[in-house]
Amino acid sequence: MASERNQTGEMAAGRDVLVGALVGHFSGRGPREELPKEVLRELGQELAASGLVRDELVAFWNLLEEGLGRVGYRRPSGGEVTVLNLACGPCIEGAIFGAYFGEPGGVDGGRNRVRMFGMDLRGQEIEKAKRRYAATEEIFRGAGLPLLRESADETAAEVEFFADDATRLVGYKEIPEAFDVVFIRHQNVWNDRLAWRKIYAFALGAVAEGGLMVITSYFDREHLIALELVKMLGGEVVVSVRNPRTVELDAPGKSADRHLAVIRRKA
């Protein structure tokens, strides 16, 4: 009973942290204390209704903190972070990435500008991603907070979604040739090993010097297969973390972000 209460308390605290980070990402506001409590309460309720602060995503935020923390990753302060989200699907995690990497690495530092690019072959999924992100922005607009990207602030986030083959990414103008973070959430190597070999090879090649590739997996065995394939392609698995708050899904042994791995390119 005490354990359940502790877990409930941890998730509630995690939701508060996530709401505060999302406020920062979309409006550029600083600490939560700068906003009236009634505004924060309204935002929390709206974000909960949208599904953006459900338990699965609170656990995902905490998993990012743990996995990247273990490899000594430190966000810049007042800098820029480029993120490529491959096979992003409807990309419910898009706002999470923006909020996470936008947080300053130091106590006195300013917010980071996050340039995030989501890519998926499936055009319908990309349209869902665009609508979802726009709907989340509308929540903050409805709460009376001006959106950071609509201001002249240089820290405004840039978020774009593309329906195309990732290997043709370099054909788009204004997109970096390499990224600080290349992310694949819920990789699916079981679906088509040859196709995923190509995706992993491209992902590793798109990592900037000193950057990271991060993957999460639904299944234990599939995660191990993915890591072996990444190693064969020249990746170094720096850390692999089991998610202690993973949310069970629709098949035995399947759960959201069951494992997370942080990978570097071998020198």
Where are these regions (language model features)?
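S-adenosyl-L-methionine
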Residues: 130-172
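A short glycine-rich, Lys/Arg-flanked "PGG" loop and its adjoining helix->strand segment in the class I
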Residues: 195-209
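Class I SAM-dependent methyltransferase Rossmann-like catalytic core
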Residues: 8-76
